[in-house]
UniProtKB/Swiss-Prot annotation:
Its main location: virion. GO terms for cellular component: membrane; viral envelope; virion membrane. Systematic vaccination of individuals at risk of exposure to the virus has been the main method of controlling the morbidity and mortality associated with hepatitis B. The first hepatitis B vaccine was manufactured by the purification and inactivation of HBsAg obtained from the plasma of chronic hepatitis B virus carriers. The vaccine is now produced by recombinant DNA techniques and expression of the S isoform in yeast cells. The pre-S region do not seem to induce strong enough antigenic response. Residues 2-163 are annotated as: Pre-S. This is Large envelope protein. The gene is S. It comes from Hepatitis B virus genotype D subtype ayw (isolate Australia/AustKW/1991) (HBV-D).
Amino acid sequence: MGQNLSTSNPLGFFPDHQLDPAFRANTNNPDWDFNPNKDTWPDANKVGAGAFGLGFTPPHGGLLGWSPQAQGIMQTLPANPPPASTNRQSGRQPTPLSPPLRTTHPQAMQWNSTTFHQTLQDPRVRGLYLPAGGSSSGTVNPVPTTASPTLSTSSRIGDPALNMENITSGFLGPLLVLQAGFFLLTRILTIPQSLDSWWTSLSFLGGTTVCLGQNSQSPTSNHSPTSCPPTCVGYRWMCLRRFIIFLFILLLCLIFLLVLLDYQGMLPVCPLIPGSSTTSTGPCRTCTTPAQGTSMYPSCCCTKPSDGNCTCIPIPSSWAFGKFLWEWASARFSWLSLLVPFVQWFVGLSPTVWLSVIWMMWYWGPSLYNTLSPFLPLLPIFFYLWVYI
């Protein structure tokens, strides 16, 4: 391709050879030899690519000349940086000096020791700051309030400040109790479901717990026997199991309440004394036989004769209810008395008993924890009742 940029107008666009003023070519000087960038005439006849595409511009550049801008070649030049502003200084400037106090607070300059003592001579100010008969030369002491109760609030300026600590505790206290109650409620509601899962797992030892009612006349999708839909045959059995579980939980709470009432001395339970056929509960006027030892819990009055006197026997309250149940059951089921020697013998083997308990806890501990973990939320409730009731 030719490199001559100053050919003698082979396509006839212009009457002159070179019109680019860069090499002093104009109508007065049509000679194109001033352009040093030229080749021989056969190379100049070759068509080059220019601003109008291949074959539309001669090798000397097209309609506007041979310069790169005329041929459509754009050259990006770096923009000159803007001139530095004359009203801007680089770096952190020092803080200007504060104006003097006499300029910013002229009223403060009016108060000096002389002005202050002169102000104290005012009876209104003197009555607020100085006691009756006091001098203004000494230290200013607050005076006790001598106003009447009806006018005591008039001396206060503005509303009293709110105690944010009391307000915060007033809001946070019930909120924390509500949150703890909701947490315990949600945990307690999982107790029947956990016990139901344990109950149904006894029927699927080593297998998958799948409801057996899904292949009946009204088939349902695969589901656990603890979550049967109402259309499943096992739905009524699930309700029966949960009803029994709720009764068991209520019985457990009732037993704990009875033991708690007995521990607090609110449930006078009197065991049967050997050789006596009558028992009584409640207070007695006098005791024919004083209580043995000292006890912080109320004694139990038993064997009430006809004269109104009774024998007071101190009963450990934590064992009173259990002992009462044992004696009540032994009086009606004689075969229970045969278990007493066996229990005494078993308790006498203390090392063996402890080793057995340790072995059972080591072997059954994880499974027992998974079974009894739903009952853990009941422990704070029982502890609260035990302490505060």
